[in-house]
């Protein structure tokens, strides 16, 4: 037996040339020259493990701190919580308890996280390169046809015509939304005798009726009377719908607590500053407080506004190069099924481009810019809708801001009113409200009624929502979802462009109701 227990012996191995050579090795399975490397690698992996655990604990601690802070902020200011009502005393003035409530936390938008990955930034660079190609092609065509290098923005200038008038119209809309709902809430919350309170409540309802009249009638009157172009109409209709949804959310969230406060349950009325902040922050769900970021990154704000402007220019180039030359004279040619099908297929590419540009410009750039200026912490305005394998998931993740409003005030309140068994009816109600709102926006912006969006959203979209449900997974379903999106966008762009030019080539000799609601592109082929 040799001392030390580690005998050094010679081991014969074959070299590359078949020769045998002697190598020293110790007892065991690990070679001497590999042992230090293995120890270093083990220590490195242990350090990585400790670092990951520390980061995960920090994030979890931050999440729990934020949740606890929100719970403290929402706790009543009295020394003891308000008494719980008995189970049989639930009234319509109390909030429904069905479903989950929206919780706001500090988080970044998904695209901001993906932009940190170089591979995804390359896709972003490809879209910028596409814009450069459109600019180069426009310059080249103008130089060949007219012998000059000049970018013309006729379509952009036409679309945003009379924008100052739209901005002036926005002022009374905003003031009505700022003053009427809050003053109505104060009148309802005022203590006093029953007769005095009834008079104040009636005055509050009159204020809300005047507010609704201003929001519904004023923008429509200005748009029709002054023949505003599409982009200026967009400003009015988006603000009209936004103010209506925010007013409803404020009243829906604040009225139950206000009525309980009148009964002496110790609940404070909402502050005017919180309501003013809510009117500008990028959410449609009212809360007294929201998680806030510590500072404002003005370079991030400028970057998002610049990207939104770039998307507007991109959309103008797409319409001017891919849509206007195809559809401008289509109504002057004889109708044929072949021409209609080819026009729809031709419009799929510009249609999906327009969808992506609207998503990126509004749901990412515009909302993030305002969120940053207001230090609004929750930036989850959308989720990964592009990975959806069902249309039900696509509808939930495409526009989280609007989905939260529909879920809270249409679906959940529908279940509260009709019972938990009426989930199908509540879901149909969500589709009906959303489809009518989308069709109204299209009708307002384009200046004519052509229910393409209503049929696609309510009928086709509703069927696909139940047929392509969440149980379908896998890449094939994602491909099918994208195929349906391509075709749907092609149908919208093709039919709406045909109707736009048909109403200009074939004006009505006499304005009638049926002439206004009947598609002109079906009969205008001169």
UniProtKB/Swiss-Prot annotation:
Localization annotation: Endoplasmic reticulum membrane
Keywords, ordered alphabetically: Acyltransferase, Cholesterol metabolism, Endoplasmic reticulum, Lipid metabolism, Membrane, Oxidation, Steroid metabolism, Sterol metabolism, Thioester bond, Transferase, Transmembrane, Transmembrane helix, Ubl conjugation
Crosslink site: Glycyl cysteine thioester (Cys-Gly) (interchain with G-Cter in ubiquitin): 281
Main location: endoplasmic reticulum
Organism: Chlorocebus aethiops (Green monkey)
PTM section of the record: Polyubiquitinated by AMFR/gp78 at Cys-281, leading to its degradation when the lipid levels are low. Association with AMFR/gp78 is mediated via interaction with INSIG1. High concentration of cholesterol and fatty acid results in Cys-281 oxidation, preventing ubiquitination at the same site, resulting in protein stabilization.
Residues in the Lumenal compartment per record: 143-162, 225-232, 331-347, 447-452, 507-526
Known tissue expression: Liver and intestine. Expression is six-fold greater in hepatocytes than in kupffer cells.
Region (Disordered): 1-37, 75-96
Protein name (Swiss-Prot/TrEMBL): Sterol O-acyltransferase 2
Record's compositionally biased regions (Pro residues): 79-88
Cysteine sulfenic acid (-SOH) modified-residue sites: 281
Residue positions of the active site: 438
Biased composition (Basic and acidic residues): 17-37
Molecular-function annotations in GO: cholesterol binding; cholesterol O-acyltransferase activity; fatty-acyl-CoA binding; sterol O-acyltransferase activity
InterPro entries: MBOAT_fam, Oat_ACAT_DAG_ARE, Sterol_acyltranf_meta
Quaternary assembly: May form homo- or heterodimers. Interacts with INSIG1; the interaction is direct and promotes association with AMFR/gp78.
Domain notes: Each protomer consists of 9 transmembrane segments, which enclose a cytosolic tunnel and a transmembrane tunnel that converge at the predicted catalytic site: acyl-CoA enters the active site through the cytosolic tunnel, whereas cholesterol enters from the side through the transmembrane tunnel.
Positions in the Cytoplasmic compartment: 1-120, 189-200, 257-297, 374-421, 469-474
Gene Ontology biological process terms from the UniProt entry: cholesterol efflux; cholesterol homeostasis; cholesterol metabolic process
Entry GO terms, CC: endoplasmic reticulum membrane
The family this protein is said to belong to: Belongs to the membrane-bound acyltransferase family. Sterol o-acyltransferase subfamily.
Protein role: Catalyzes the formation of fatty acid-cholesterol esters, which are less soluble in membranes than cholesterol. Plays a role in lipoprotein assembly and dietary cholesterol absorption. Utilizes oleoyl-CoA ((9Z)-octadecenoyl-CoA) and linolenoyl-CoA ((9Z,12Z,15Z)-octadecatrienoyl-CoA) as substrates. May provide cholesteryl esters for lipoprotein secretion from hepatocytes and intestinal mucosa.
Pfam families linked to this entry: MBOAT
């Amino acid at each position: 037996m040799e001392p030390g227990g580690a005998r050094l012996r010679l081991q014969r191995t074959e070299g590359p040339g078949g020769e045998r050579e002697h190598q020293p090795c110790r007892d065991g399975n690990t070679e001497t020259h590999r042992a230090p490397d293995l120890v270093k690698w083990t220590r490195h992996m242990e350090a990585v493990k400790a670092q990951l655990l520390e980061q995960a604990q920090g994030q979890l601690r931050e999440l729990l701190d934020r949740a606890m802070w929100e719970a403290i902020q929402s706790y009543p200011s009295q020394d003891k919580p308000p008494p719980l009502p008995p189970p049989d005393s639930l009234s319509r003035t109390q909030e429904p308890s069905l479903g989950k409530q929206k919780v706001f936390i500090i988080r970044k938008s998904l695209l901001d996280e993906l932009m940190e990955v170089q591979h995804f930034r390359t896709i972003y660079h490809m879209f910028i390169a596409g814009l450069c190609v459109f600019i180069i092609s426009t310059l080249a065509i103008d130089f060949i046809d007219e012998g000059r290098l000049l970018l013309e923005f006729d379509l952009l200038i036409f679309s945003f015509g009379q924008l100052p008038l739209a901005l002036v119209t926005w002022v009374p809309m905003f003031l009505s939304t700022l003053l009427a709902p809050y003053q109505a809430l104060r009148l309802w919350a005022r203590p006093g005798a029953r007769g005095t309170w009834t008079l104040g409540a009636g005055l509050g309802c009159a204020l809300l009726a005047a507010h609704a009249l201003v929001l519904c009638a004023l923008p429509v009157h200005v748009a029709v009377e002054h023949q505003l172009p599409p982009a200026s109409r967009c400003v009015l209709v988006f603000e009209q719908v936004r103010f209506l949804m925010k007013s409803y959310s404020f009243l829906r969230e604040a009225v139950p607590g206000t009525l309980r406060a009148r009964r002496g349950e110790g609940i404070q009325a909402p502050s005017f500053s919180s309501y003013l902040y809510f009117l500008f922050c990028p959410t449609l769900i009212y809360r007294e407080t929201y998680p806030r970021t510590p500072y404002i990154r003005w370079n991030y704000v400028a970057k998002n506004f610049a990207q939104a402007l770039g998307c507007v220019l991109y959309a103008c180039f797409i319409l001017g190069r891919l849509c206007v030359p195809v559809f401008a004279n289509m109504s002057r040619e004889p109708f044929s099924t072949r021409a209609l099908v080819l026009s729809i297929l031709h419009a799929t590419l510009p249609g999906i481009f327009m969808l992506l540009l609207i998503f990126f410009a509004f749901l990412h750039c515009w909302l993030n810019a305002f969120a940053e200026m207001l230090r609004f912490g929750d930036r989850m305005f959308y989720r990964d809708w592009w990975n959806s394998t069902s249309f039900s998931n696509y509808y939930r993740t495409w526009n989280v801001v609007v989905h939260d409003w529909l879920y809270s005030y249409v679906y959940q309140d529908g279940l509260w009113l009709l019972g938990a068994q009426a989930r199908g009816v509540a879901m149909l109600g969500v589709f009906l409200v959303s489809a009518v709102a989308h069709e109204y926006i299209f009708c307002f912006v384009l200046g004519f009624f052509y229910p393409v969006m209503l049929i696609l959203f309510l009928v086709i979209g509703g069927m696909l929502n139940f047929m392509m449900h969440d149980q379908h997974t896998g890449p094939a379903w994602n491909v099918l979802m994208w195929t349906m999106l391509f075709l749907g966008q092609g149908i919208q762009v093709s039919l709406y462009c045909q109707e736009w030019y048909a109403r200009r080539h074939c004006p009505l000799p006499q304005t009638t109701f049926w002439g206004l609601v009947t598609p002109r592109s079906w009969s205008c082929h001169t």
